[in-house]
Amino acid sequence: MDNLNDAQKQAIVHKDGPMMVLAGPGSGKTTVITKRTKYLVEKHGVNPRNILVITFTKAAAREMKERFEQLMKGECQVTFGTFHSVFFYILKQAYHFTAANIIREETKKAYIKESIDRLNLEVEDEADFISNIIGEISLVKSEMLPIEHYYSTNCAEEIFIQIYKEYDQRLRRNQLIDFDDMLVYCYELLSQRSDILAMWQNYYQYILIDEFQDINK
C-alpha cells in the first residue's frame, strides 16, 4: 500500500461498521474498494462469500471484478454486481423467478399501446408518448410514490393512473416484472420478512457500494 495516501489506507484497513468515502473522479475509489476487499479477505480473515460489492452498471461491476481477481491472482468468491442483479438474485431465491419473468422492452411498449387504444387516446407522436409514459411509470415505482399524488406531464392525471394500473395488472397477470419491480419487490420482501432479511444479513456481512451518493432511497 506504499503508493496510497493516508485517507485511502484508512478506508482500506477499516473493518467493522459503516464508512462513507467521499472522493472526486479519478481519485482512486475503485482501487480503494478492490484493495479493501482484498484486505478483508487476507488480513481480517473474512470469508469471500460474505462480501458483496455493488455498483451501478454491468461494465463497472465487471471491471471491478477483473481488477480484484488480478489482485488476488485468480478467481475469488466475492459477489460483484449491480443493484438490479443483486436484488433479482434475492428475488430468485424467494420467488423462483427466472430471466423469463423479466418483461422485454417491446412487450412493455405493447402493454402501453393497448391502453392507448382501449382509451381511444389521441396523441401527436405515439412512440414518444409511450416512451415518456414508461419513463414516468419507472419514476413512480423507483421512488415509491403514491400513484394518486403523481401528476403526469404527458396526460391527464386520471388517464395516467388508468394506464399505470392496467400496465401493472398486465405484468401480474403474465407473471412478469420490470427492473423497477426488482427494487420495490426486494425492498418489500426484506421489510416484511425479518427471517429472510436476517438470512441475507448473515450471508453478506460486508457490503461495499460504489457511487453510493447516487442512490435515491
Regions found by a protein language model. Give the residues of each.
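ATP-hydrolysis module of ASCE/P-loop NTPase motor domains
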Residues: 75-77, 95-181, 204
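P-loop NTPase Walker
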Residues: 1-101, 198, 217
